[in-house]
A protein has these predicted regions:
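Bacterial N-terminal signal peptides that target proteins for export
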Residues: 2-12
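Bacterial N-terminal signal peptides
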Residues: 11-23
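An exposed, glycine/acidic-rich loop-and-rim segment of catalytic or binding clefts
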Residues: 24-62, 67-388
Length: 388
């Protein structure tokens, strides 16, 4: 039995009450307003290139700010149960913070999100060697992944909402990957309190591709402390166990009877320090969950509720997996927005994705994109509040 602090026990009790209300989760009352999208300067890169911030606001007042460097989501303001707006994502106040070595706060990650074992794979008889940046492995595209490049950006608006489209071309051989890859990632904020991400990509040579978004959430608000009391539901009967370097073993293991069973809603803190070899391997949760699906349509993947604020987050995706990461490597050395020091487990990520190291696991869903075909996927984050 894992020891649970009195504070966490109280939080879990509140979460249980909210769980009973989750089917009635609703957005805050509509406020009179008009959706808008604006563009403003956000600093200059060492190369001399200018970076811009795009601010998306829906009719209800929810606001997303993102920059064209890394497609990074700077802030995301949503209301709590009392109607008070707070920023619910981790990050920095200025560009300088993101230019340092960071834990991918808010960024688009690729060309291959997550890990590739030993930084190598074989494709069509040729072996490719990638830049390694995570022990022996390649992580999130390598040393200069999509999180560290300037994207071309343009505002968008259609019947669904306001947005910004980011486009980037990754040249053949960059970080060791084959093929010139053109990627378009569109962020859209709707008046239904949805933040949708649409990914598209084409290539001129066969290449592995795995795109994701690496935002760290804290539904109590940025700088509000740990997320151990957040109640998480993940629609997955299985997960992919990992070795000591966080590379999947190839097994699709049942979550039943393990700390990885989030099918009915569990507080993050209940199992995060369990005496389980997989928990020890990740220092908490840093694992891919195999979503329950029968096709590649948009399906519900996860739900998070914060009993302190009443905020809820639902995630739907066309991807086969989601990486649940609990900020285990935040160590108190990073100072973020408004002087907040980010300590262990101060945020969580739900990174929709294909499985880690898929190029080396033919039994996993394929991540190989070939010329003449287009990769496309969609992820939707929906924000709400539980009724009082």
């Amino acid at each position: 039995m894992t020891f649970v602090s009195a504070r966490l026990a109280r939080t879990v009790a509140a979460a249980v009450l909210l769980l009973a209300q989750l089917d009635c989760t609703s957005s805050p009352e509509a406020r009179t307003g008009k959706a808008s999208a604006t563009r403003a300067p956000f600093g200059v890169l060492p190369s001399g290139d200018s970076v811009h911030v795009f601010t998306l606001t829906n009719a209800r007042g929810i606001e997303v700010r993102a920059i064209d460097y890394g497609g990074i989501i700077l802030s995301l303001r949503t209301p709590d149960q009392a109607g008070k707006f707070d920023d619910i994502v981790l990050g920095y106040d200025d560009l300088a913070g993101y230019l340092k070595s960071t834990p991918y706060f808010g960024a688009i990650v690729g060309r291959y999100a997550n890990r590739i074992a030993k930084g190598q794979f074989t494709l069509d008889g040729a072996t490719y060697h990638l830049a390694t940046n995570n022990g022996p492995n390649a992580l999130h595209g390598g040393i200069t992944g999509f999180d560290k490049v300037l994207w071309k950006a343009e505002p968008t608006q259609d019947s669904t909402g306001v947005g910004v489209a980011f486009t980037y071309t990754s040249r053949d051989g960059v970080e060791g990957y084959p093929g010139t890859l053109t990627v378009r990632v569109t962020y859209t904020l709707t008046d239904r309190d949805e933040f949708a991400i649409a990914y598209r990509a084409t290539t001129d040579k066969a290449t592995p591709l795995n795109l994701s978004q690496h935002t760290y959430f804290n539904l109590s608000g940025d700088g509000a402390g740990d997320v151990l009391g957040h109640l998480v539901t993940i629609d997955a009967d299985r997960y992919t166990p990992v070795d000591t370097t966080l590379i999947p073993t190839g097994e699709l293991a049942s979550v039943a009877g393990t700390p990885f069973d989030f099918r009915k809603g569990v507080a993050i803190g209940l199992g995060i320090d369990a005496a389980h070899p997989q928990i020890k391997a990740g220092g908490g949760y840093d694992h891919n969950f195999v979503l329950n699906r029968t096709n590649d349509s948009l399906v519900h993947a996860a739900r998070v509720v914060d009993p302190r604020s009443g905020r809820t987050l639902d995630v739907a995706t066309t991807q086969p997996g989601v990486q649940f990461y609990t900020g285990n490597f935040l160590d108190g050395t990073l100072t973020g927005k408004h002087g907040h020091v980010y300590s262990r487990r101060n945020g969580f990520c739900l990174e929709t994705q294909h499985f880690p190291d898929s190029p080396n696991h033919p039994e996993f869903p394929s991540t190989i994109l070939r010329p003449g075909t287009e990769f496309h996927s969609r992820t939707v984050y929906t924000f709400g509040v539980a009724p009082k």
